[in-house]
Amino acid sequence: MREALKIIALTVGLSCAYGIAHDQITARVCIEYFTIGHFSPANIPWTPTVLGLYWGIVATWWVGLILGIPLALCACVGSWPKRSAQELLRPLLLLLAITFACAMTGLVISRLTNFTAPPHLLPMVLNDDQAARFSADLVTHNISYGVG
């Protein structure tokens, strides 16, 4: 039971760390993705750094939990060889590195091609430049969720 909790804590912690790193970049590409595209509590100075920290945790802890519970069950229950959190660290880091590389590739391609998402996916208050940057963030986040 203790090892299962370690595995769940590991996946939640790594997910949050990934989310913070990811959102530190995307908040600087398009702050409107976070301020207009998402509900953010009032009375907080929403700088790109604060947004990246806040959304990096809020948007990813649950992904780590959803992945961690079945991973812990597979690693700790049944007749197959048991796996520790330590043994799972390297494969999880590899998964996050691949996910990050794919997401950043999507971000770069989106920006280089000036991709703009279909209008129904964008807030109406954005100008053309904001729409392209918002679209790049949208692509980057969707790649992270899809690959990860």
Predicted region positions:
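N-terminal membrane topogenic signal
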Residues: 1-11
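Cytoplasmic juxtamembrane regions at transmembrane-helix boundaries
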Residues: 69-94
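Short, membrane-exposed interhelical loops at transmembrane-helix boundaries
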Residues: 40-44, 119-140
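Hydrophobic alpha-helical membrane-insertion segments
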Residues: 10-22, 90-113
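Hydrophobic alpha-helical transmembrane segments
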Residues: 48-63, 130-148
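Juxtamembrane non-transmembrane "cap" segments at the membrane-aqueous interface
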Residues: 104-128
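Transmembrane helix-loop junctions in multipass membrane proteins, especially transporters and channels
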Residues: 23, 27-35, 72, 76-80, ...
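Perimembrane loop-to-helix junctions flanking transmembrane segments
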Residues: 32-49
